């Protein structure tokens, strides 16, 4: 089973964590500034009423507790927080795949500069969902899916 770390506790991070953990095919961890406000059981409800319920393996504000045991690190952050997050996780990234939901704000340039060659990189052109928090760290609404997604890999 692969382990995915979601960096970011906002609406997008909560929805992505809910959708991924719902499959039960991956273990999901969340790196957030406010771990005490998160529940281990989370859910997102889409605009058709489909419910994505999942259970998180771990929630922390300490990169050293989450990143080393993760196979994939996915930044679910606004562009202005990506560099700060990359610096936070850099000491613990060895050979993981590191990606960003928002990569059109310079993610690849920042990741090369900060991580060097220690990670495989990937990024989405745009966010895959429109998301809104219902209750922080517990539930969110997935208000719409993108019809098409583009992704870059290195």
PLM region spans:
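Hydrophobic/aromatic beta-strand patches that form the interior of the parallel beta-sheet core
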Residues: 29-31, 60, 74, 99, ...
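Short beta-strand/turn micro-motifs composed of small residues
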Residues: 8, 32, 77, 102, ...
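Rossmann-like NAD(P)(H) cofactor-binding subdomain of soluble oxidoreductases
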Residues: 79-138
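Rossmann-like NAD(P)-binding element
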Residues: 51-93, 100
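Residues at the C-termini of beta-strands that transition into short coil/loop
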Residues: 32-34, 63, 102, 125
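NAD(P)+-binding Rossmann beta1-loop-alpha1 motif at the extreme N-terminus of oxidoreductases
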Residues: 1-51, 67, 92
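Short beta-strand and adjoining strand-loop segment in the mid-core
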Residues: 137-154
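Nucleotide donor/acceptor-binding cores
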Residues: 2, 96, 147-149
């Amino acid at each position: 089973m692969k382990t995915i770390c979601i960096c970011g506790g906002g609406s997008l991070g909560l929805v992505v964590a809910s959708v991924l953990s719902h499959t039960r095919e991956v273990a999901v961890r969340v790196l957030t500034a406010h771990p005490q406000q998160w529940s281990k059981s989370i859910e997102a409800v889409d605009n058709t009423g489909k419910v994505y319920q999942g259970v998180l393996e771990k929630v922390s504000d300490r990169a050293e507790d989450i990143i080393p045991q993760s196979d994939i690190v996915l930044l679910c952050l606004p562009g202005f927080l990506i560099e700060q997050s990359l610096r936070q996780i850099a000491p613990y990234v060895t050979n993981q795949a590191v990606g960003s939901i928002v990569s059109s704000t310079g993610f690849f340039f920042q990741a090369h500069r900060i991580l060097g060659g220690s990670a495989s990189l990937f990024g989405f052109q745009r966010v895959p969902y429109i998301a809104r928090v219902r209750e922080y760290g517990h539930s969110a609404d997935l208000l719409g899916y993108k019809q098409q997604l583009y992704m870059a890999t290195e």
